[in-house]
């Protein structure tokens, strides 16, 4: 399991991020910290190694950026993803200077959160896989694609135009309906796992918008709806 530490002084936000983490297979939240002092205690003194830190910037009496040089000087192996409302260029530049692996501006979509964590894991695994790289492999690792840039809307391996058409036709016929993965999978008679792959792709293409809801049990449910400004893209896949 990948151990995640959440640093945020807002208890409700920290809990929401903890639930997001719990929804991604292979990740677990092993602690939360509302101060930088508490965070350093967990990072440097805990028996559980911290693989990934989710760091807020604007805290009540502290700036989350102050933790980055501490980690850098200590040669800490924990990677950092910033999750903050800070959108100014200076803060972003400082964060990137200290090597944060991703930066999410609040409020963010659940799909973007998942993309940040799974993308980081993919790169981490790739780095541990080889001792040496050729240029094409390095391009893939750094840029997420080969030097011959591919169409981002090209279906990835394992997804078929026929199934995509079926899903898009159902979504088109229910434009005002916000639906879950389970609901759509049942309607078009495909597996939930397969359906979720198509939905993630549609979200990444900005055709669908995703939000998270909590039922009476507190279990999060992702729901999807059409992004009106990209409705024409959906229609293309209905043909």
UniProtKB/Swiss-Prot annotation:
InterPro entries: 2C-system_Tx_regulators (IPR051271), CheY-like_superfamily (IPR011006), Sig_transdc_resp-reg_cit/mal (IPR024187), Sig_transdc_resp-reg_receiver (IPR001789). Keywords: Activator, Cytoplasm, DNA-binding, Phosphoprotein, Transcription, Transcription regulation, Two-component regulatory system. Member of the two-component regulatory system DcuR/DcuS. Involved in the C4-dicarboxylate-stimulated regulation of the genes encoding the anaerobic fumarate respiratory system (frdABCD; nuoAN; dcuB; dcuC; sdhCDAB; etc.). Weakly regulates the aerobic C4-dicarboxylate transporter dctA. NCBIfam families: PRK10430.1. PANTHER family: TRANSCRIPTIONAL REGULATORY PROTEIN DCUR-RELATED, TRANSCRIPTIONAL REGULATORY PROTEIN DPIA. Its main location: cytoplasm. GO terms for cellular component: cytoplasm. It is found in: Cytoplasm. CDD domains: REC_citrate_TCS (cd19925). Phosphorylated and activated by DcuS. The modification 4-aspartylphosphate is found at residue 56. Residues 181-200 bind DNA. This is Transcriptional regulatory protein DcuR. GO terms for molecular function: DNA binding; DNA-binding transcription factor activity; phosphorelay response regulator activity. The gene is dcuR. Residues 3-121 form the Response regulatory domain.
């Amino acid at each position: 399991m990948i151990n995640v530490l959440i640093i945020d002084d807002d208890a409700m936000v920290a809990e929401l991020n903890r639930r997001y983490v719990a929804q991604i297979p292979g990740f677990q939240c092993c602690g939360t910290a509302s101060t930088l002092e508490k965070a350093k205690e967990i990072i440097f003194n805990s028996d559980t190694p911290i693989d990934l830190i989710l760091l807020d910037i604007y805290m009540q009496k502290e700036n989350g950026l102050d933790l980055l040089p501490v980690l850098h000087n200590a040669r800490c192996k924990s990677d950092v993803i910033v999750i903050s409302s800070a959108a100014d260029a200076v803060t972003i530049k400082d964060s990137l200077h200290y090597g944060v692996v991703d930066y999410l501006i609040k409020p963010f979509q659940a799909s973007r959160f998942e993309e940040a964590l799974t993308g980081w894991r993919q790169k981490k695994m790739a780095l541990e896989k080889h001792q040496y790289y050729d240029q094409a492999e390095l391009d893939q690792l750094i840029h997420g694609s080969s030097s011959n840039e591919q169409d981002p809307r090209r279906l990835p391996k394992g997804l078929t135009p026929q199934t995509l058409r079926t899903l898009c036709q159902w979504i088109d016929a229910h434009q005002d309906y916000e639906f879950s993965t389970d609901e759509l999978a049942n309607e078009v008679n495909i597996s939930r796992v397969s359906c979720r792959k198509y939905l993630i792709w549609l979200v990444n293409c900005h055709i669908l918008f995703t939000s998270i809801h909590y039922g009476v049990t507190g279990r999060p449910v992702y729901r999807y709806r059409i992004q009106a400004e990209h409705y024409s893209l959906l229609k293309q896949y209905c043909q």
